[in-house]
């Protein structure tokens, strides 16, 4: 069985789904529906497979730079110079980082999400959170209703998202998630395998140029000191694409539904301290609100459903 525990991180609302064997999935409902921890009991200790915030002090100190675990919508990644265009209109967003002039990660990643439901049985627990974007913002005047549905079994979780255009006009839309994964040791010691992909080429400000090149580096390859901060376009658009991270003691599979209009891209980022790696499912390249390549457009009343997740196997 599973228990839902309310355990605020200081002033930030936090829920923990706890399995009877001690496995836990921790979600910051008060901050972007963010995945904050995934703890698995092993023979020797407890393994936390997600980088997150341990104290309120560390949260407020680094959350704006890391955005760890949060849902990214109605765009993911960078919007160039915090300006975008749609049907002849220009919209101005907030430049929300100090190190670039862009707008990053959408509009819901720092919002409080509401608990809609929680159910569980012997096999799994399902937590549903909801958020309504009213459209009362000159930078994105398109209202939508969003739900994030977490299903947790202990050694796996999935995240299903639903987004409904609640306005009267067509709505451009893009989405991603921003989890940082860890296997309890430096990522230098891990191997990485990604789906067959093309690397998205970017300019000096990390905005896609429209060009891509075949990616061949990551096929069960040792990470070593490799720095990655790249977006990859998945080439075989199938129901599930897998990114696999391995250590000597565990294998982590991060999967994403990658059919047309789903998570067709992955952003991968190696954290500077080499303790974690962001593996981010994305529907589009960064800056899609400007370049419009394969842009998703939701009609009034239309709902988009997406899904990704992760599972771990422990080698005893």
Label each residue range with its predicted role.
Residues 92-93, 170-172, 179-257:
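Active-site/ligand-binding surface loops and adjacent short beta/alpha elements
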Residues 80-81, 136, 294:
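Short, conserved secondary-structure segments in the cores of folded domains
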């Amino acid at each position: 069985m599973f228990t839902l525990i309310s355990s605020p991180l200081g002033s930030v609302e936090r829920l923990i789904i706890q399995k009877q064997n001690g496995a836990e999935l921790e979600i910051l409902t008060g901050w972007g529906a963010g995945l904050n921890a995934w703890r698995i009991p092993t023979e020797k200790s407890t393994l936390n497979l997600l980088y997150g915030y341990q104290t309120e002090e560390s949260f407020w100190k680094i959350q704006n730079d890391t955005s760890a675990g949060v849902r990214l919508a109605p765009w993911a990644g960078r919007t160039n110079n915090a300006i975008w265009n749609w049907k002849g209109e220009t919209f101005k967003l907030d430049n929300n980082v100090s190190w670039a002039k862009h707008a990053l990660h959408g509009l819901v990643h720092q919002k409080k999400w509401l608990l809609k439901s929680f159910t569980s049985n012997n096999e799994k627990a399902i937590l549903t959170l909801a958020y309504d974007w009213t459209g009362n913002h000159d930078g994105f005047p398109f209202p939508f209703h969003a739900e994030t549905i977490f299903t947790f079994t202990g050694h796996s979780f999935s995240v299903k998202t639903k987004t409904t255009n609640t306005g009267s006009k067509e709505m451009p839309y893009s989405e991603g998630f921003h989890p940082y994964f860890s296997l309890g040791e430096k990522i230098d010691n891990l191997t990485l395998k990604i789906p067959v992909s093309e690397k998205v080429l970017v300019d000096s400000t990390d905005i896609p140029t429209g060009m891509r090149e075949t990616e061949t580096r990551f096929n069960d390859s040792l990470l070593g000191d490799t720095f990655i901060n790249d977006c990859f376009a998945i080439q075989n658009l199938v129901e599930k694409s897998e990114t696999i991270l391995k250590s000597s003691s565990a294998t982590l599979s991060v999967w994403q539904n990658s059919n047309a209009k789903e998570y067709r891209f992955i952003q991968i980022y190696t954290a500077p301290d080499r303790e974690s790696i962001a593996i981010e499912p994305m529907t589009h390249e960064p800056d899609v609100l400007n370049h419009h390549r394969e842009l998703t457009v939701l009609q009034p009343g239309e709902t988009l459903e997406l899904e990704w997740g992760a599972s771990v196997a422990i080698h005893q």
